Amino acid sequence: MGCGASKVDKEGQARNDAIDAQLKKDRLAQKNEIKMLLLGAGESGKSTILKQMKLINHGSYSAEERESYKEIIFSNTVQSMRVLLDAMERLDIPLADATNAPRAEIILGLSPSIESSVLPRQVADAIHALWGDAGVQACFGRSREYQLNDSAKYYFDSIQRMAEPSYLPTDQDVLRSRVKTTGITETHFKIGELNYKLFDVGGQRSERKKWIHCFENVTAIIFLVAISEYDQLLYEDENVNRMQEALTLFDSICNSRWFVKTSIILFLNKIDLFKQKLPISPMADYFSDYTGGADYNSASEYIVNRFVSLNQSDAKTIYTHFTCATDTSQIKFVMSAVNDIIIQVNLRDCGLL
């Protein structure tokens, strides 16, 4: 009897030890699992950041993946030229070269969605000729007055390469492609010992009510702002300045009861376009209290202060980074800095800092 009881006790202890070991392993895994929300207004660059995470952590795109982006890239390019041509009519800007009129008709007669693995040479030649037209260039110079994708110039400049029968999109081609995000997407990647789950939600106003599902147990928020859009209007409401919308959204997220102590990492994105735009579109025209002229340092400091000053909580830290989401090496450096921030946040939450 005694020996039998002893055997049962040993088996029970072994099971308990196994359960304890598994619980310890689960706690350790949970500690190393980081949930982050990727937030920001529409077209701020969130999807591009997610593509960069794939490039940085999983390597370059496969040939099959590149092939799958061709229709998106072709459609983005054609849609952008259609937007330009429509804007020319609305703004009463004529083509400088009348012989380009039939080429404009070719583009306007196309479906907005190109369902082909090869860009027709006639379409590519039409876009190439139109992009060289002084009237089209004049309209492009007024792109803040209508809704044009940031990638338009890049794709127009690359149109002959894209029309080659052997064309396969480069990483940069893929990074600049645009598909509206709807619903919630989840991206997994690892930096050092930490396993990240990064949730991207639709940035357009109609998508925001869906964010609530991502809120629980979030370690930190990455909030993206396209600082180059200080002179542009919303896609959904052309009476609202995009930067003002971003400020309003940041205020609501930063001071939400869901995020009282949640650290926010602010990515001030599209600095390349911002630098190009400052000398030709005075920021003071849109923010009357700005007095720094076209100086990049003054303008960027002003925008940082506008966002950071909205924070009403002493318990919350806001970390800022200036980014160009299409620059892989820069995003790799910034994400390394983000990882350091997350480690500090983890240590703080565990009472070790």
From Swiss-Prot:
Region span, G3 motif: 196-205
Matching CDD domains: G-alpha
Lipidation (S-palmitoyl cysteine): 3
Pfam families associated with the record: G-alpha
Transcription listed as a keyword: no
Residue span of region G1 motif: 35-48
Lipidation (N-myristoyl glycine): 2
Boundaries of every G-alpha domain copy: 32-353
GO BP of this protein: G protein-coupled receptor signaling pathway; pheromone-dependent signal transduction involved in conjugation with cellular fusion
One GO term describing the cellular component: heterotrimeric G-protein complex
PROSITE patterns: G_ALPHA
Sequence positions that bind Mg(2+): 47, 181
Binding sites annotated in the UniProt record for GTP: 43-48, 150, 175, 181, 203, 269-270, 272, 325
Similarity annotation: Belongs to the G-alpha family.
This protein's name: Guanine nucleotide-binding protein alpha-1 subunit
